């Protein structure tokens, strides 16, 4: 782009024409929207839409280390004291817990024998389970998250035990209890991606190549511009040789826009956003695998574990057991039970 010569008539100052070119790398694709949008209705499948995008919730653990680790740790803690039984295997109980914590609800399909009696339960992925207006359910099954082909299974309300975490804004679906920390998890991920690009691109944010040398020909200018443009990509930008015959020592300057190595807030963003994620999950830092930065450490993990068990693990276990055991088709042999945790020294 060329700027025309302009004259300030009041001061008689001539503003010289400027040849300016800008070069930038392609932008990172924005993270999926994870706002709470409330309940919608899908006319195509005749079902309600969850308040938070389920596909985005499914991808979120892969974007943030703290969030993904805490989800699995919470699922392990809740399912650890499950005694097992005919209704659910221990692996299925863990799948139940992970779905419930990650998505805020989980559906259990009743498997019946030839007489119509319930003989076991199977947890369905909350990613694909949808609720109908009449109380029934659709399971929009896919082989993988990115598969366009899908099969739709429809179930009556009596065939599904639906466990959900209470949401005061709607009572159709549950809602994950960490919603307030989603943006912090995304910010933490964005900071990491930015730093990766920073190092991959030669550890610089960018620069201005400033030339005032009259001996710089248009051919040389085009060649320099081409070289800079071709330097985009991982590790490609290193150095450039420019020879201007009879040029001036200060005729060509590189002016850095900024050096994120010393000026950015990467460490602060990572630390604060990680704390937000822990707070959203109400998960003790002493159990999260965080390396303490002070001499005092993070306290006694055994004490944290005991308190966390009584305040967070047991209430979730009670919700699971109560919802399953109160179903009239669940007989004594299929009832769910968690053993008491003994923290005695």
Curated annotation (Swiss-Prot):
Coiled coil: none annotated. It is found in: Virion. Keywords: Capsid protein, Viral capsid assembly, Viral contractile tail ejection system, Viral genome ejection through host cell envelope, Viral genome packaging, Viral penetration into host cytoplasm, Viral release from host cell, Virion, Virus entry into host cell. InterPro entries: PBSX_Proteobac (IPR030935), Phage/GTA_portal (IPR006944), Phage_portal_PBSX (IPR006430). GO terms for biological process: symbiont genome ejection through host cell envelope, contractile tail mechanism. Pfam families: Phage_portal. GO terms for cellular component: viral capsid. Homododecamer. Forms the portal vertex of the capsid. This portal plays critical roles in head assembly, genome packaging, neck/tail attachment, and genome ejection. The portal protein multimerizes as a single ring-shaped homododecamer arranged around a central channel. Binds to the terminase subunits to form the packaging machine. Belongs to the phage portal family. PBSX subfamily. This is Probable portal protein. It comes from Haemophilus phage HP1 (strain HP1c1) (Bacteriophage HP1).
């Amino acid at each position: 782009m060329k700027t025309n010569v302009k004259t300030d008539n009041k001061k008689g100052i001539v503003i010289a024409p400027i040849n300016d070119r800008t070069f930038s790398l392609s932008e990172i694709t924005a993270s999926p929207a994870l706002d709470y949008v409330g309940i919608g209705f899908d006319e195509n499948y005749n079902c309600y839409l969850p308040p938070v995008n389920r596909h985005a919730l499914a991808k979120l653990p892969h974007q943030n280390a703290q969030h993904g680790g805490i989800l699995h740790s919470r699922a392990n803690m809740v399912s650890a004291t499950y005694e097992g039984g005919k209704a659910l295997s221990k692996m299925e109980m863990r799948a139940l817990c992970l779905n419930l914590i990650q998505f805020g609800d989980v559906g259990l399909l009743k498997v019946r024998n030839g007489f119509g009696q319930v003989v076991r339960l199977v947890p369905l992925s909350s990613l694909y389970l949808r609720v109908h207006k009449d109380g029934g359910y659709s399971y929009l099954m896919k082989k993988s998250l990115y598969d366009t082909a899908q099969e739709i299974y429809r179930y009556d309300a009596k065939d599904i035990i639906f466990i959900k975490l209470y949401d005061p804004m709607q009572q159709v679906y549950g809602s994950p209890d960490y919603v307030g920390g989603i943006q912090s998890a995304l910010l933490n991920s964005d900071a990491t991606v930015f730093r990766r690009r920073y190092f991959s691109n030669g550890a610089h944010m960018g620069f201005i190549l400033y030339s005032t040398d009259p001996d710089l020909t248009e051919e040389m200018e085009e060649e320099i511009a081409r070289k800079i443009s071709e330097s985009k990509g991982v590790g490609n930008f290193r150095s450039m040789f420019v020879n201007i015959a009879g040029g001036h020592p200060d005729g060509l300057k590189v002016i850095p826009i900024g050096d994120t190595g010393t000026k950015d807030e990467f460490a602060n963003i990572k630390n604060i956003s990680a704390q937000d994620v822990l707070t959203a999950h109400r998960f003790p830092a002493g159990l999260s695998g965080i390396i303490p930065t002070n001499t005092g450490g993070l306290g006694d993990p055994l004490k944290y574990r005991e308190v966390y068990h009584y305040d967070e693990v047991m209430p979730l276990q009670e919700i699971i057991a109560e919802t399953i055991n109160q179903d009239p088709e669940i007989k004594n042999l299929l009832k769910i039970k968690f053993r008491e945790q003994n923290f005695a020294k």
